[in-house]
Amino acid sequence: MITKTIISAITLSGCLLANAEASGCPDQYPDGVVPVVRNPPASWNNLIELCAPHGGFVDGYSPVLRVPLYAVEHLTREHIIEHQRNHEGRTDSFRPDDRLTHDQRAELGDYKRSGYDRGHMAPDADSWDEASEYDTFVLSNMVPQAPDNNRELHAHIEGAVRHLAKQDGELYVYTGPVFQGDTQYLHRRVAIPSGIFKLVYDPRTHEASAYLENNVNGPQGQTYTVITPARLTELTGIDFLPGIQTKPLDLPVPRDSGSFGHSRKHGFF
């Protein structure tokens, strides 16, 4: 059973997440608006904000579940172009987050021989240089992800969102886990999500929609639906765009070919 974790100390690089005034990296959120946890289990209280040292993303991290409940990126055309110009191949640097205590964080051993990938929430491919890429490899930016989903559909969704950001100029992208039913754990420590979401908000048009995927192997791990921010709040208990009025965003259909169509489907997971 999960019990509430008491956080006794907060470092300069991680703070209890309560409001925009408390944020250590307000520029990562649209208009500085921090997500609000509306209806969580008691054990989800005390999310820790973990700002990437070199910018680019911020994680809202649960020291109880030992996964981020979301990662937020301010994804820009300039960053994508810089990545394409500078990237010379991925260098894996998976490591525990030393901003957290052992009791609060996931360790490499938690994932060993688990059958799950260490799935990035803020993707390494969204980084623009070696330092920002290195930032993405802390385990506080990971969830246990089914390999078929992580390496195929989810990767294609990431690519589709980059394509849209390059086309539109800038987006705010929220990625995280969904927990439905009885939650399973790696070594009784790291929560395994039943699904993965990626919410995309265009600040220019005030449009937003989310991809929702099954976190499983096989054909079910290759299916997704598109939902509204309100439906995502129902599923996660988190209001990602509090006070922001949005219209549906026409999300691109993820494809492995590099060419992206568009989907106007808005269904439910």
Task: Label the model's feature ranges.
Residues 16-269:
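Domain-level detector for secreted/extracellular nuclease and nuclease-toxin modules, and
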Residues 4-15:
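Bacterial N-terminal signal peptides
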